[in-house]
Amino acid sequence: MSCTIEKALADAKALVERLRDHDDAAESLIEQTTALNKRVEAMKQYQEEIQELNEVARHRPRSTLVMGIQQENRQIRELQQENKELRTSLEEHQSALELIMSKYREQMFRLLMASKKDDPGIIMKLKEQHSKELQAHVDQITEMAAVMRKAIEIDEQQGCKEQERIFQLEQENKGLREILQITRESFLNLRKDDASESTSLSALVTNSDLSLRKN
């Protein structure tokens, strides 16, 4: 009788241990199932992100980006050439202004030399006439030079904006490619991990079933 009770207690103890093992296995299965569900959700999210990126890439293909960059580069070269021509024209007008000033000084010198022999009144009128004509030329050239400087400044600012835009497009294109590469690699890794975890989970379930059947 005593042996029978001890055997029953031992069997009960062993059964409790097995139940604990099964509980641990069940907890492990639950955790793995939760992890798999999370990975499935992550895969769905990655797929959605890939679709969104594909939509972006479809609407803005690489050829379009390259053509846009080439067009902006051409515009920048045209602006630089125009600025060069404006600078050349400005230098020519400044040279013309210096030539006029030189002619004016030469004319004044002749007038001063002739003033000793000619009527002072006529000399004064000639001086006034030449001064007015010279001032008109100086004002006109100064105004043209100011307009050209302003145009050059505006073109240079526009050229800087175009260069910034090209840099932004290049960075955006680079970022899209990096994101696509990361998502592809992550998706492949998830598939590999899921395959290995599914194999482990199947083995664990099989072992648990075998243990239950033996009991």
From Swiss-Prot:
UniProt region (Disordered), positions on chain: 194-215
Keyword list, A-Z: Coiled coil, Cytoplasm
Location of the protein in the cell: Cytoplasm
Segment forming the signal sequence: none
Record-level GO cellular component terms: cytoplasm
Biased composition (Polar residues): 197-215
Keyword Coiled coil applies: yes
Residue runs in coiled coils: 5-104, 161-185
Biological process per Gene Ontology, one example term: response to wounding
Function summary: May be involved in wound healing pathway.
Family the UniProt entry places it in: Belongs to the SIKE family.
Name of the protein this chain belongs to: FGFR1 oncogene partner 2 homolog
Organism: Pongo abelii (Sumatran orangutan)
